[in-house]
Swiss-Prot record:
It is an enzyme of class 5 (isomerase). One of its GO terms (molecular function) is peptidyl-prolyl cis-trans isomerase activity. Residues 276-362 form the PPIase FKBP-type domain. It comes from the Eukaryota. It comes from Schizosaccharomyces pombe (strain 972 / ATCC 24843). This is Probable peptidyl-prolyl cis-trans isomerase C27F1.06c. Residues 144-274 are annotated as: Disordered.
């Protein structure tokens, strides 16, 4: 794991200023930490009144039993960062770090003077192997952590076809092995001599088995007439098989505006995402080399108004038409993403790939 730092500053000139401006990261939350080391007044300001900068943090507080509720609870905390005054205290050294996941705002109180907070943006680079492991554990199996139909997600289909074939092959071999063991055990039992005092009991059991076999044969014959073959399954196994068959169905790729390409992995059955609707999403963002640069797979879903340029153009185009419960892969050309702008973890002129799932439409 490596780290790199870039210069970063915030101008506090309103009552409530966010840590990250929307234009800085276009609605996507990044795995970034920010450390501020200096607060300074604008020397051109005319006001001589003292000005105070407060910090407001908004942290998520899950319920005591560890499960998330339908409406997640949040609590705001406020504290004073510094107080400056023109003519006496133009700047003040500070040392404060905001970690990834914190929702932070700055509040200006007092004089009508802009205050500049400066420092560094700390970027943590996670090795691909470690990131891939986290992705498999959280993204594929994170569904058990959510209970709400609107805000919780099933596991997203990101397993490759080769892995599915290997898994299916392993299961087939295991089933064949179990059947061979059962047949061998049955042959061994038949070969063992039966004591005379057990002959009557065995005869009774054999008679019951014969009757059961005749009943089963009758059922199989009845099903064969309708072109079906019944198979005894444990409770719930049929539903799981149907769900897996649905998730592995292949849908055609579609080329949309700006050469944005989408391919559905799972078709949803809920309300459809339309322009000007507010949607809640889970997602994993990758570069074309497979490296993950951003993701939202746990906690509060990523929510925005579709088609109103609150996110990159590729999302406004690629999400339209999805239904709640649906999963989709979106390939976005650089021109429909961040273009020539370089962002933490995203080189300039990068094509992006997103695996997304639609949780809710409001």
């Amino acid at each position: 794991m490596s780290k790199e730092e870039t210069l970063y500053s915030v101008k506090v000139d309103q009552e409530r200023v966010p840590l990250f401006d929307e234009d800085f990261y276009k609605g996507f939350r990044s795995e970034l930490s920010v450390r501020f080391t200096m607060a300074a007044l604008d020397p051109r300001a005319k006001s001589n009144d003292a000005v105070t900068v407060n910090v407001i943090t908004r942290l998520e507080h899950p319920e005591e039993d560890g499960e998330e509720s339908d409406e997640e609870l949040f609590q705001e905390e406020k504290f004073t960062l510094c107080t400056l005054k023109k003519g006496s205290v133009y700047q003040q050294p500070i040392d404060i770090i905001f970690s990834p996941g914190e929702e932070v705002f700055f509040e200006r109180v007092g004089g009508d003077i802009p205050v500049y907070l400066s420092g560094t943006c700390i970027i943590t680079n996670i090795p691909e192997e470690e990131d891939s492991s986290d992705l498999e554990n959280d993204f594929l199996y994170g569904a058990d952590e959510f209970s709400s139909d609107e805000e919780e997600m099933d596991d997203i289909s990101v397993t490759s076809s080769e892995e599915e074939e290997e898994e299916n092959g392993a299961r087939i071999e295991e089933l064949n092995s179990d059947e061979e063991d059962a047949e061998q055990a049955e042959e061994e039992i038949l070969e063992k001599p039966v004591p005379k005092d057990e002959v009557a009991e065995k005869h009774s059991k054999d008679k019951l088995k014969k009757e059961e076999k005749e009943k089963k044969t009758a059922v199989d014959v009845s099903d064969s007439v309708n072109g079906k073959k019944r198979k005894t399954e444990p409770a719930g196994e049929g539903e799981q098989t149907e769900k897996k068959s649905k998730s592995t169905k292949t849908y055609p790729k579609q080329v949309l505006e700006g050469n944005v390409t989408v391919q559905d992995k799972v078709k949803g059955d809920g309300p459809a995402a339309k322009r000007k609707k507010r949607v809640s999403m889970r997602y994993i963002g990758r570069l074309t080399n497979g490296k993950v640069f951003d993701k939202n797979i746990t906690g509060k879903p990523f929510t925005f108004n579709l088609g109103l340029e609150e996110v990159i153009k590729g999302w406004d185009v690629g999400i339209v038409g999805m239904q709640v419960g649906g999963e989709r892969t979106i390939h976005i050309p650089a021109a429909m993403a961040y273009g020539s702008k370089r962002l933490p973890g995203i080189p300039a002129n990068s094509d992006l790939v997103f695996d997304v799932k639609l949780l809710a439409v409001n």
